[in-house]
């Protein structure tokens, strides 16, 4: 799963206003048998997404025709709580989400999103409700704004995560940015 740079991003939204959506609800443990990051998308929100007979649940917002192709998930508070499985971020990315806007995130889940090229954004309830009522919204990561029509909202993000996402860098690429310093240190401290 390559990490694509995120600078300005416009996408279709889907609301899923549940609080405390945990990683087992995002990707049930029964589907954690893969050894790669891909292939988890069909199992994202498995217990909500499908009816007992395996057909799509028509009441689950992401299954509704008006939300088809949504790449921005707008959700409640404490998103990604529960176990620290990175599979939850993999499943959401593989499903097609690039941006998740919530009232709050589990710290580990937030980090797993950024490690996998997804931008997690924290906004208040009124802002999320307004954005969820729009068909498309635009995120400007360098300026840290989310906008739709005539309204714009600021969000906070650590400069390290921002740098990573704007430049499409994974952990190895970040380390390689310091290759000269690492080499200097190793040469200086040869035993």
Curated annotation (Swiss-Prot):
Spell out the molecular function terms from Gene Ontology: 3-isopropylmalate dehydratase activity
As its record notes, the protein acts as a catalyst of: (2R,3S)-3-isopropylmalate = (2S)-2-isopropylmalate
Q: Name one GO biological process term.
A: L-leucine biosynthetic process
- This protein's GO CC annotations: 3-isopropylmalate dehydratase complex
The pathway entry for this protein reads as: Amino-acid biosynthesis; L-leucine biosynthesis; L-leucine from 3-methyl-2-oxobutanoate: step 2/4
**Cross-referenced Pfam families:** Aconitase_C
Q: Does the keyword Oxidoreductase apply?
A: no
Keywords assigned by UniProt? Answer: Amino-acid biosynthesis, Branched-chain amino acid biosynthesis, Leucine biosynthesis, Lyase
| Signal peptide from the UniProt entry | none
Q: What is its EC number?
A: 4.2.1.33
Tell me yes or no: is Amino-acid biosynthesis among this UniProt entry's keywords. Answer: yes
Q: Which InterPro entries match?
A: 3-IsopropMal_deHydase_ssu, Aconitase/3IPM_dehydase_swvl, AconitaseA/IPMdHydase_ssu_swvl, IPMI_Swivel, LeuD
The cysteines joined by S-S bonds are none
Family that this chain belongs to: Belongs to the LeuD family. LeuD type 1 subfamily.
Q: Cross-referenced NCBIfam families, in alphabetical order?
A: leuD, PRK01641.1
Q: What does this protein do?
A: Catalyzes the isomerization between 2-isopropylmalate and 3-isopropylmalate, via the formation of 2-isopropylmaleate.
What is its quaternary makeup? Heterodimer of LeuC and LeuD.
Q: Which PANTHER family match?
A: 3-ISOPROPYLMALATE DEHYDRATASE SMALL SUBUNIT, 3-ISOPROPYLMALATE DEHYDRATASE SMALL SUBUNIT 2-RELATED-RELATED
- Protein name, please? 3-isopropylmalate dehydratase small subunit
